[in-house]
Structure formats: structure tokens, C-alpha cells
Amino acid sequence: FPIVTRLVDATPVKVAEKNLCADVDAFLAAVTDKTKILFLANPNNPTGSFLSLNELKRLRAGLPDHVLMVLDGAYAEFVTADDYSPGVELVDAGDNVVMTRTFSKIYGLGGVRLGWSYCPPEVADVLNRIRNPFNVSAIAQAAGLAALEDTAFVAKALTDNETLRAWTTEKLTGFGLSVPPSVANFVLVRFPLDEAQNAEAADAFLKSKGIIVRRMGGYGLPDSLRISIGVQDEMTALVDALSEFMS
């Protein structure tokens, strides 16, 4: 978000989270007359937390009408919580909410670069006027249509993700690591601050085992690693490696 904001000579304003979750009150306090767009990743990356539909409604109600609220639901398909919504109701209720989604996550088409948006016609008209011609290739469109038809794959990916996320969380917390609740296809793992067992040392150890995770220093979480949920063999290898590291 900061990169695309600066591309149009705008000023990005980061809003602090509360307990690793977006804070509606902090968002509203940060809004000024100059605010044009509010971007919210829901579920959030890299924490895996989310705002409920009621909190989203409270956020939209507290924003000035001139502020466009953009809900990035890249990980929405992984969420099974009853109080979650990607924002369809908010788009339907007004003319200043945009919902964006991607085929890069649960559909496994990250390299295809295909996404979509549900938004007011006026917003779609602006996007159509500024987008590049032929911005979505025929191959990407074909891949997207095939992915939408393969509902069995999506259902299995969702079930496997829930099972292995819970299993991985249980194993890692058993090693004394902190793993905040996640509704996405990854977990945020927080490590001790001592040099021998901190996140940097854990990352290096995992790399020596051929396991790649994501360092979180750039997100303001230098004590953490983000670990994607894969298949059982991959998660077993990860757990075994971290068991060795923590011992």
C-alpha cells in the first residue's frame, strides 16, 4: 500500500494495531480532511487477525463520506469465523466501499497475477479508464475460470489448512513459542529475544534444513517469523526442525 500511494504523490499514513489486530478507533483518529482512501487488509497479513463485520460497519460509519474504504480480502476464503465478512454488505450499502480479492492464495495462482474487485459502478468506471489495455491475459482468464470450477480443490484446501494450522499451532506453543490466533493460511510465530533462540537464529536454522519462512522485521515484528501452512509432510518437517532448534 505505501508503494502505490507514493506512486501517485500521496502520503501514506500507517495506523498502529492493538494486540496485533487492526484498531477501528485508531483508524478513525488518524483520519483528517486530507484523507482520501483507507486500505484495510482483512484478514490481516502477517498476523492472521481480522475485524468482524460489526467492526467494519463501525469503521465505515465513522469515516467521512469522501473517504473511500478499500477492503483487501486476499485471505478471505480461508476464514470460517461466523462474524467475518469480506465486505459485500458494505459495498451494497453505499458508494464508497471497495472489496478486492485475488486468485493468488487459496486458488494457488500466485504467479498468474489475477484478481478482482466488487465495487460501485463509479469506481469501476475510473479503474477502467486508467488500467492498461489487455491488463489480464487470456491465459490468466482461462486459469481463473478453471480454478472457480474446481470447487473440490478449494474445499480440500480449506479443510486441510484448518486442520494443519491448528496442529502446527499446538506443536509450536508446546515448545514455548507464542502463536497468536490466525484465520489465514499462515501463523505468526514469536520467538524469545535472546540471541541463541531469536527469530533471526531460527530463520537461519530453518534455512539450513531447506525450510523457507518469512522474517517480519519489515513489519515492525523483529521477534517473529511468518510460517505458511503447507501439506502434512512440510509441516511435520517444520515442527521437527523447530523442536530441534528450541531444544
Q: Where are the model-predicted features located?
A:
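Substrate-binding/gating loop at the entrance of the active-site cleft, primarily
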Residues: 1-10
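Active-site pre-lysine segment of PLP-dependent enzymes
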Residues: 6, 22-34, 46-69, 73-106
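PLP-dependent enzyme catalytic core of the Aspartate aminotransferase-like
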Residues: 54, 201-204, 208-209, 214, ...
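PLP-dependent aminotransferase class I/II
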Residues: 96-180
